Amino acid sequence: MKNKYLALGDSIVEGYKLQGKSFVYYLSKDFDIANRGMNGLSSNLLKYYRGDLKPFTHVIVHIGINDFLQGYENAQVEKSIVELVDIFKSEDLKIIFLKPIIIAQEACDYNWCSKTHYPLIKERLINYREFLDKLGQENNFKIIDLMDTTGIDIYDNLMDGIHPNLKLSKAMGKYIGTKLLQEV
């Protein structure tokens, strides 16, 4: 059976302000992949995704930043992620989680968060990234760390402290594609 990927998640998956050219667009040149990203999506909403999972062999998930921007605590987010993993496992999907970039303080200048809350959001994201590593090891699924995207300065290529510009989106697509090919 040919690998068929489903990309689920937030605005990073959708391609906020990139006219559909998120990392998924660049992956689609080499992979059979569907994009189901949605701006503003959080993990507690993603677990209610009821799209058809049957045609897919793999699911690529990027989620979590909005949860922390909306004030959710790690325990709440982790519970939702475990529920998601259980859903994907029950559908026999190979799971790939993308560890999100730790947002830049510049996000506060664009009103994504307040300067008062930024340190807490950053701390929660750091803890969440560690949680994903542990969960991936325990459940034998792939983790791709977007902070490791090669050949580009990540923070110089965020439009607003959170969202990749076109250059970073393309680099992320290339990096993720390289990691996916290592699996084959």
Predicted regions and their residues:
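Residue-level recognition of beta-strand->loop/alpha-helix junctions
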Residues: 35-37, 99, 145-147
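A structural signal for the hydrophobic beta-strands that form the central parallel beta-sheet
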Residues: 7-8, 97, 143
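Substrate-gating cap/lid alpha-helix
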Residues: 107-146
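Conserved SGNH/GDSL esterase-like catalytic core that processes O-acyl groups on lipids
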Residues: 2-7, 12-87, 124
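Short aromatic-enriched loop/helix-cap "lid" or pocket-rim segments at secondary-structure transitions
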Residues: 19-20, 48, 107-111, 154-157
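Alpha/beta-hydrolase-fold catalytic nucleophile elbow
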Residues: 62, 98-99
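Histidine-centered active-site loop/cap adjacent to the catalytic His
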Residues: 46, 157-184
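A short helix->loop->beta-strand "cap" motif at the edges of active sites that frequently abuts
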Residues: 90-95, 141
